[in-house]
Structures are given as C-alpha cells and as structure tokens.
Amino acid sequence: MDIGRKIELITKRPTEELLTVENLRHLLEIGAPMQHYIGFEISGYIHLGTGLMAGAKIADLQKAGIKTRIFLADWHSWINDKLGGDLEIIQKVALTYFKEGMKQSIKVMGGDPDKVEFVLASEILEKGDYWQTVIDISKNVTLARMMRSITIMGRQMGEAIDFAKLIYPAMQVADIFYQGVTIAHAGMDQRKAHVIAIEVAQKLKYHAIEHNGEKLKPVALHHHLLLGLQEPPVWPIESEEQYKELKTQMKMSKSKPYSAVFIHDTPEEIKQKLRKAFCPAREVKYNPVLDWAEYIIFREEPTEFTIHRPAKFGGDVTYTTFEELKRDFAEGKLHPLDLKNAVAEYLIELLKPVRDYFEKHPEPLELMREIKITR
C-alpha cells in the first residue's frame, strides 16, 4: 500500500484532527516502526463514543498496516477516582469486561481484535525506569502547564484536586515514549497531553523515540467525540465559541445513561434513548442524532441508509451520503422522529453481535452490575 493511501485511511472519519499530517508522512517515508496506542481509563459501561469511535479508527489503522495497542490505564483510573478508586476492582474490570467489550466493538467496526495488543498499565509502571521517563518529561514542562492539562481527566481548572492528579498528565505523556509509540490516539478531549508529548519529544534524555539516529516526534490522532443525546443547558447556541465549548461538555457520558447508548444495550433501550434524544427539526449544526449518523452510519461513503416511512409521509427514502441526509433534514423534508427511528434500527442491527457475545458470556457484565458505577 502506498503512503498516500495509508494517510487517507488514518485521516478518514472519525478522525477529527491529526498532528501533523506532515510528520506522519515523514515517519512513513523514513520507514520508522509504526506503533499505535490508545489509552483508556477503566470506569463504567462502554458507550458508543468509546467502543465504536475507537474501534472504527483501530480498524482503519490496521488496514494501513499499523500495529495497534490498547492501554488499560489502571493506575490512571485509580488516580482519577474511577470505580471508587479501588485499584484491585479497576484491574479486574480492565481484564474482563473492558477488554472483551473493546474486542467486540473493534470487530463490529471492521477491525481484527486478535491483532490488537492489550497492555495493562501496571505491567510497565512497576518498572523503575518508567518513572525516570515521567521525571524527564516533568523537567521539560512548567507546573502551570501541568495544571492546565488536568482537563484531560474530565476535571476543571480551579477544581480542588489531590496532588496525585498533577502527576497524571506527565504519566500519560510517559506512556507514549516508554512504549515507543509513533501514533498516539485518543478523543479530542485528550489533546493537551498529546501536544505536550510532541513539544518535549526531542528534549528527552530517556526513552526518546529514535530511528537511524533521529529523535522522532509522535503523531497525535484525535477522533471525534460523539455528542450526548441530551438537550444542552443553553439553547439556542448563539456563537461559534459557545458551540465549541458545548461540543466537549455535551459529549456522551456514562454517568448520564440517557445521554449515551452502551454497546450491550437491548433493542428496547436503544429505541427508548433515541426517542428521547434532542433532535430539533431542521437543526443541523447541533444535533446529536445527525452527529451519530455522520460518524457511525456514514463513516464509509457511499453507503445505503434507508429510512422507512408510511406512504402518507413520503414513503421510504434511501440516502447514500451524509450531505444528502443533512440537506433533507435542514429543508424539513425529513421528520426528527423518522430520523430517530432509523438511526435506532441501524444501531440495533450493528450492535447485535456485541449483545450476542455478552448473552453467551454474561460474567463480565454481571461483574459490572455488582460494582457501583462512578463517573
């Protein structure tokens, strides 16, 4: 496969940003070992924003010949008080429910879960020279910068936090270099940590990424954050700045069950959540249901997406591109309820293999139901 085609696969939807395309091209041209990683905190149920968005991108990377890795961030989850801050429970969930759920998500999005390496953070954090890398990074970043970066944990600047949380950004950057990662992958909300990684890459003394004597900068790949289904706290949205802020604030959240569809939700749960979804008629700029259609259904174009309607409401209509769907919705030719029902039916069918898996292997899900789910 030529370099141009590899770049197309890596930058296609749901990629929202690549820092930078020029650096990616350089790494491919010099034949640097291409190692991807995406790290996850272990907390509640896996929703579509985690499972399908990451799964889709992993599938693309595999097609481009990139080695893929999922980093099960147990220590990071402990620092960020996930699952009650109980490290033993976090590790148990990571190696059962979360690992199996991500494998099934990757599979339904066209990837090969058997070609994904799963690494538990403890396996590398318990090695002494990992912390040497953390210190090396920390010596190249100001305290003020680290404090601004705590938003990667879903924390707000100015929020009262324990000191361990200030170590978190340096650990996340160290994860990249210690594992020799050339493609650091995450949602857009992790951007601050990745920018630090790019900036310190050529200053590091320990575990810098090198190829033929050249210190390399990693590429940062950020996928789209699916919007949560709930109505935003401010409506209508009047400014572009307000819209950008809301996009991150209103992402899908496992702590707000009706904002998210989980990968193992029943057909009735999926229908119910979509029926209640915020989907104003003719609104195409901020519309969670359209957002899901764009990044899940129309990830590959052209495709065929049929919306079934009674003849008196125009009959069935089939769209092959997202722009066609968006145009009809903007012009009022497509009713919100018809869109919601069609997206729900698509998701029910897409997620059937995941539901089937957890019906045959109920133990991981039963474990999750026994644990108090925290944000």
From Swiss-Prot:
Q: What is the lineage of its organism?
A: Archaea, Methanobacteriati, Methanobacteriota, Thermococci, Thermococcales
Pfam families, alphabetized: tRNA-synt_1b
Q: Where does ATP bind?
A: 254
* InterPro entries cross-referenced by the UniProt entry: aa-tRNA-synth_Ic, Rossmann-like_a/b/a_fold, Tyr-tRNA-ligase, Tyr-tRNA-ligase_4, Tyr-tRNA-ligase_arc/euk-type, Tyr-tRNA_synthase
In terms of NCBIfam families, this protein maps to: PRK08560.1, tyrS
Question: What does the subunit comment say?
Answer: Homodimer.
The species this protein was found in: Thermococcus onnurineus (strain NA1)
Q: Which reaction does it catalyse?
A: tRNA(Tyr) + L-tyrosine + ATP = L-tyrosyl-tRNA(Tyr) + AMP + diphosphate + H(+)
Q: What does this protein do?
A: Catalyzes the attachment of tyrosine to tRNA(Tyr) in a two-step reaction: tyrosine is first activated by ATP to form Tyr-AMP and then transferred to the acceptor end of tRNA(Tyr).
Record-given protein name:
Tyrosine--tRNA ligase
